[in-house]
């Protein structure tokens, strides 16, 4: 039997007597792509940090890729988990080239701390090529557009061939055209036979495309609901999630949200 990619059991997280996550149980099977949906401040970022070993739960059990956190080498695990966040852009050395940023993903590091081989640079260039971003390989990060930077960060996450890819609100800062191009690229990636299991974190239902098979709603640090998109993305659930009357519409395969207040 294949082990789940993610298995959280009764995870709680407290900081300075404040409970941020409560009784989170979540199981993700290989190849099952999920969206994690919730309002700002609901605990999404903390949950991601727990999944990647940057925070430790106060209570509960975390298993990722069959390994129980606390009983495995977290450094090695991070090389198997790709994490893309717009916040990462601020931590990148401004003068690093795009291909340097991608290559740093081989070590799960921010910046380069060793000499990379020609083969490693070629592998990095190949991932950029697959994402249609080969032309920016030698450009400094500081000169890249937001859309180009997102492709570079995706390439950085993919270069080590991760088994789990976490995208933390990747469309923040993108104009409508750039966002649609990005979502199209992501859909193509998800449909590849060797694609990693993907978790897309967002608070916009418009970004939940048909390749996403499951949705988890997080509210006030607790699981509000989880299941297939058609069952979860409803007027009732969205109104409860955002504490505001909402209507949900379909335009073809796309979800649309209207605030009714």
Stretches found by the model and what they are:
Residues 60-70, 77:
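Conserved ABC transporter NBD signature motif
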Residues 161:
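Conserved catalytic motifs of ABC-family nucleotide-binding domains
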Residues 115, 140-144:
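Conserved ABC ATPase signature
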Residues 52:
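Helix-to-loop junction immediately C-terminal to a conserved catalytic motif
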Residues 118-136:
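Conserved ABC ATPase "signature" region
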Residues 6, 20-23:
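Conserved structural motif at the start of ABC-family nucleotide-binding domains
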Residues 165-169:
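Catalytic Walker B motif of ABC-type/P-loop ATPase nucleotide-binding domains
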């Amino acid at each position: 039997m294949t082990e789940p990619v993610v298995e959280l059991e009764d995870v709680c997280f407290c900081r300075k007597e404040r409970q941020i996550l409560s009784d989170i149980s979540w199981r993700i099977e290989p190849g099952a792509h999920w969206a994690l949906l919730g309002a700002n401040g609901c605990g999404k970022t903390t949950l991601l940090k727990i999944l990647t070993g940057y925070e430790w739960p106060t209570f509960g059990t975390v298993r990722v890729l069959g390994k129980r956190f606390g009983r495995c080498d977290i450094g090695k695990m991070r090389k198997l988990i790709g994490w893309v966040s717009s916040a990462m852009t601020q931590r990148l050395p401004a003068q690093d080239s795009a291909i340097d940023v991608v290559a740093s993903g081989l070590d799960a590091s921010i910046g380069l701390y060793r000499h990379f081989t020609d083969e490693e640079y070629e592998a990095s260039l190949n991932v950029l090529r697959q994402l249609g971003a080969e032309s920016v390989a030698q450009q400094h990060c500081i000169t890249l557009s937001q859309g180009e930077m997102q492709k570079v960060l995706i390439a950085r996450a993919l270069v080590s061939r991760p088994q789990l890819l976490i995208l933390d609100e990747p469309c923040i800062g993108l104009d409508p055209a750039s966002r649609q191009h990005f979502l199209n690229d992501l859909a193509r990636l998800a449909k590849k036979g060797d694609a990693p299991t993907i978790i897309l974190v967002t608070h916009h239902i418009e970004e939940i495309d048909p390749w996403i098979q499951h949705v988890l709603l997080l509210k006030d640090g607790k699981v509000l609901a989880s299941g297939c998109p058609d069952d979860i993305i409803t007027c009732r659930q969205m109104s409860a999630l955002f504490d505001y009357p909402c209507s949900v519409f379909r335009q073809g395969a796309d979800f649309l949200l209207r605030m009714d207040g």
